[in-house]
Amino acid sequence: MSETAPKPETVEIYTDGACSGNPGPGGWGAILRFKGIEKELKGGESPTTNNRMEMMAVLVALNTLTRSCAVDVYTDSEYVKKGMTEWLRGWKARGWKTADKKPVKNDDLWKALDEAAARHKVSWHWVKGHAGHPENERADALAREGIADLRART
């Protein structure tokens, strides 16, 4: 009888970004869950865009992990999911140009996300935003707190 290797422990990451105006002041939020323990992260910057805040949420969350691991990322951003799973390979092959030869928008964050994701075994999942998904709703609240914190500092 052969033993099967146990499934590696998986970190769950739930992310969201928000922007008050696009561009405008923006915030991001992330929840990391591992073995029932949660860590919440949030931040903001201005001026920025909603897409950049969606990306920052994932980037900061992945960079918070201190060792390589299996990760399930849950995002309501098709831009982030498709960018990482469908578009990134082509952009890199074309020297960070789109299929119609234009520079990739947010290439600084795409490069950083690519590097951060490469340190882990990441599975990307899309969830419908504002549809009652508890972790997505919490990540959205954190992103909005990120905007509020930013405004309180300025």
Curated annotation (Swiss-Prot):
GO terms for biological process: DNA replication, removal of RNA primer. SUPFAM superfamilies: Ribonuclease H-like. It catalyses: Endonucleolytic cleavage to 5'-phosphomonoester. Mg(2+) 2 binds at D16, D140. Binds 1 Mg(2+) ion per subunit. May bind a second metal ion at a regulatory site, or after substrate binding. The keyword Magnesium applies. InterPro entries: RNase_H, RNaseH-like_sf, RNaseH_domain, RNaseH_sf, RNaseHI. GO terms for cellular component: cytoplasm. Its EC number is 3.1.26.4. Belongs to the RNase H family. NCBIfam families: PRK00203.1. This is Ribonuclease H. It comes from Paramagnetospirillum magneticum (strain ATCC 700264 / AMB-1) (Magnetospirillum magneticum).
